[in-house]
Regions:
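Small-residue-rich segments of transmembrane alpha-helices in multi-pass membrane proteins
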Residues: 50-60, 97-109, 129-130, 173-178, ...
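Loop-to-transmembrane alpha-helix initiation sites
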Residues: 17-20, 66-73, 92-96, 139, ...
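Transmembrane helix-bundle core of multi-pass membrane transporters
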Residues: 2-16, 87, 91-154
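Helix-loop-helix "hairpin" substructures at the membrane interface of multi-pass membrane proteins
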Residues: 135-207
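Short juxtamembrane and helix-loop transition motifs at transmembrane-helix boundaries
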Residues: 3-12, 26-37, 54-64, 156-165, ...
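Cytosolic-side transmembrane-helix boundaries in multi-pass membrane proteins
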Residues: 245-285
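Transmembrane alpha-helical segments in multi-pass inner-membrane proteins
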Residues: 198-249
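Short loop segments and helix-boundary regions at transmembrane helix junctions
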Residues: 33-115, 211-223, 242-243
């Protein structure tokens, strides 16, 4: 029995998949907490689809996919920030514009050279088939992103809570926003290989949403979110060996399951807690 449970650890491709998935899950969850704080969840969705033309272009030119994806993600993030500052358009309009424009361009590029572009890898991911060079790319992206987040998490928290206060204590909110969107683009690049473009949004939203239901303190929310992201990603990759199912689908399914449990049973913000408060209010009347 124990030998069977430990079997995935004896295969190099599975070991790589598990630790890389955990790293990517933790980073996406770290950023997820800030997206929840600012109400920017849809920006994660826009970026996850905006990197598609970069990936398609990289495949067509024979370049590392991460290079093209990061360039496209950075361009999309910069375009959203620029339009938000200068156009006067509403945020959801800007997100929709960037999302559809970049994704449409990506699909057009795929149609130009369908044999050189792995559509399935772009849309669904394939963490079990990553090459050593891809693993190195993801490791570099992951550890650099995580290091910056650990150093700057307080500055980002202050900026996202109150930009005026951030300026008053010497921080530059615009620079920190650029840093955040750069890190978000990097995490979307990493998550693309893990779960694909269609499911990246789940990895940068669900852990933060789950943690939000469980605590009101932001440092604790960060810790819970990262733990949820790393654990569900590891378990999803691990169980995919036995179930023979899509790793990305399993990861997102576990994250959704934890969210539903928290939504129902969270001690303060859960559905059952709200029902109890409503019942007590009726009794008091």
């Amino acid at each position: 029995m124990i030998d069977t449970l430990l079997q995935p650890f004896f295969y190099g491709y599975m070991f790589n998949a598990m630790w890389v998935s955990s790293l990517v899950g933790a980073i996406c969850a770290f950023l997820s907490a800030y997206l929840m704080l600012k109400g920017w969840s849809l920006i994660g969705d826009a970026l996850s689809h905006s990197i598609v033309p970069g990936v398609a272009g990289a495949y067509m030119l024979g370049l590392p996919f991460a290079l093209g994806a990061f360039a496209a993600g950075g361009l999309a993030a910069g375009a959203m920030l620029f339009l938000n500052e200068r156009s006067g358009l509403k945020e959801d309009t800007i997100i929709g514009l960037i999302f559809t424009s970049f994704f449409g361009l990506g699909l057009f590029m795929v149609s130009l050279s369908p044999t050189s572009v792995s559509v399935q890898t772009i849309t669904m991911g394939n963490i079990l088939a990553i090459t050593p060079s891809d693993t190195l790319q993801l490791a570099i992206i992951g550890f650099v992103t995580l290091a910056i987040l650990l150093v700057k998490w307080k500055d980002l928290m202050v900026t996202f809570f109150d930009e005026s206060h951030a300026r008053s204590i010497g921080l530059n909110p615009n620079v920190l926003k650029v840093v955040f969107f750069t890190l978000l683009s990097a995490s979307c690049v990493a998550a693309l290989q893990t779960v694909g473009a269609f499911l990246v949004i789940a990895m940068v939203v669900t852990p933060g949403a789950t943690a939000y239901l469980l605590t009101d303190r932001f440092p604790r929310l960060l810790l819970l979110s990262v733990s949820i992201g790393a654990l569900t990603s590891f378990v999803g990759a691990y169980l995919s060996f036995f179930i023979d199912g899509a790793t990305g689908g399993l990861i997102v399914s576990f994250q959704t399951l934890l969210f539903l449990v928290a939504f129902i049973f969270a001690p303060k913000h859960g559905y059952m807690a709200a029902r109890r408060r409503a019942a007590k209010a009726l009794e008091a009347e």
